[in-house]
Regions:
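Charge-biased low-complexity segments
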Residues: 1-174
Length: 174
């Protein structure tokens, strides 16, 4: 949610409320399970989302990698197949998928950094593995390998609304 807001995009208040409620519930459960946990520092990891700004060798990327015809978040949302059981139970969450884009724009080594549910991780990997080639990053006018971390949100209400819109558009065409 914070990432979406930082990009200047809108997010439903309900989605923010659901995410905050889930985080509070998780914190409450963690406190019950381990009452002294707050005394020990806990590192969960903070991942920067989007393209890495430097190459593996440390050079500053001048032109970031991108999909040619569509924003990567729009592509992911359009390709998403929500796990049926999780959709039925209104389970929301996310997956963070990191991958490398090679000099030809081919995705290499996609892997999950973090996810709230194994099925969300599987779906995020499927989406990334099926992506078309990217326009690679450039340094000094030459294509270079670069890393990208994609945040894939799973919001059941939003997904259901998008399905309804698609169904209406399809029925208009027929």
């Amino acid at each position: 949610s914070a990432y979406i807001l930082s990009q200047g995009e809108n997010i439903l208040e309900q989605a923010l409320a659901e995410e905050a409620t889930a985080l509070l519930k998780e914190l409450e459960n963690r406190t019950k399970e381990q009452p002294d946990a707050y005394k020990r520092p806990m590192y969960v990891g903070i991942y920067s989302v989007g393209p890495k700004l430097k190459t593996h060798s440390g050079k500053q990327i001048e032109e970031l990698p991108h999909l040619t015809d569509v924003c990567v978040q729009e592509y992911a949302a359009g390709q998403m197949v929500y796990p049926a059981e999780l959709l039925k139970n209104n389970v929301s969450g996310y997956a963070l998928c990191e991958f490398t884009i090679d000099k030809e724009g081919v995705i290499l080594r996609p892997h999950i950094l973090k996810s709230t549910h194994p099925e969300f991780a599987e779906e995020a990997l499927r989406i990334v593995k099926e992506m078309p080639n990217w326009t690679p990053a450039l340094v000094g006018g030459k294509a270079v390998e670069s890393d990208y971390t994609l945040y894939v949100p799973f919001r059941p209400q939003l997904y259901k609304e998008q399905l309804q819109i698609r169904e209406r558009e399809l029925s208009k065409k027929h």
